[in-house]
Amino acid sequence: MPEQDHLTMTDIVVSPHFDDGALSVASTLSKGPSALLLTVCGGAPTGAGDDEWDRLCGFESGPAAASGRAAEDRAAAALAGHDVVHLPIPDAPYRTAFPTAAVTAALAPLLRPDVRVWAPVGIGSHPDHVGTRDAVLTAAAGTGCQLLFYADCPYAFGSGWDAADRDRPPADRWEPQLAALAHLVDVDCPRITRLDDSTMRLKIAMLRCHASQLAGLSVDHPHFMAWEGPLRQEVFWPASVLAPSLEPTLGSSA
């Protein structure tokens, strides 16, 4: 659990992987000590196998990737001044079903009516992103916390922020994932945040801490780190009501 008194936290960013918070919600993480970044897939796999992405990023094994990326995340957090929590859950390539029950149990003690909880929409259709979203929905039910859903970067801007959904690759389309949240958010009225220079400077510095990921991300998203590039924008959908008693609409196995 977080090092600081969790009663002082106003914002909890729930990130599927180590770099997703910095990529998508830097405007909130820039608040420093009042924010907490909780990474769901923050654990090492039990075996010594490897994944193609981890190999591309320079890691010889899954455990090496988990250790190295956790260190990168702590370095990024030190720049912004926020605390981090890494749940002991490995990435999707190293497990079978998403552990919804374990994630829900870890989140539950942190959720209060005066806390804003930031969760991924699930754009990109990655099982860890969709599973994280659904676990947040389950954990938040009945707590009264304020839910906000963020556009998952880089999937969300891969074809351009303003692209028509039909022109995006099927997995990166926004509409199917937003449809799962239509009972909570106004799908057609996102909150668009353009980062000021100070926050953009911090965001770039945080992402440079996640150095292992940059080469791989640049293959499909060249120049995404440009000063006036797509990272300058962040997109959110606030829930129109406080977290009600509800069931996730696109659940993952517990």
PLM regions: where:
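Active-site beta-strand->loop->alpha-helix modules in alpha/beta enzyme cores, enriched
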Residues: 1-142
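The feature marks non-catalytic terminal segments
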Residues: 2-3, 69-87, 92-98, 142-254
